[in-house]
Amino acid sequence: VKYLHTMIRVHDLDATLRFFIEGLGLRETRRMENEAGKYTLVFLAADETPNAEIELTHNWGSEEDYGSARNFGHLAFRVPDIYATCARLQSMGYTIHRPPRDGHMAFVKSPDRISIELLQDGHLPPQEPWASMPNTGSW
């Protein structure tokens, strides 16, 4: 058995790509446009795990509400500096729903409300402003 990918349906492909590429540092590995089916598939991967991909599926012109992403659970990424990653995502307009108070774990949501867990690679001591930030909403 070989794990291939996790598929996520997205409403705004550009916003979602910005979140995963600029915000988290993933890279686009391939893209397929299907004119007949009216959809785009974009595959993303992290440099350290190139064979474990996320497939973004964008159905052209769809206004369908895919429901609450929290039912999905979450995607998890190990990051080299959780504070810098959270600061970058926050500067891009994303809410850090569970701040990295302990220097180890945080949660943010993608543009399509997918819960994303960020885990620190190695140890960082707690630091402000993160250490005293409360949770915001659900994560």
Residue ranges of model-derived segments:
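Vicinal oxygen chelate
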Residues: K2-H11, T29-M32, T40-E48, E64-W139, ...
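Generic domain-boundary/flexible-linker signal
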Residues: L17, D65-G67, L124-P129
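Short, P/G- and charge-enriched loop/turn segments at secondary-structure junctions
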Residues: R30, S62-E64
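Active-site/binding-pocket entry motifs
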Residues: T49-P50, W60-S62, L124
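Core segments of cupin and vicinal oxygen chelate
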Residues: M7-N51, S91
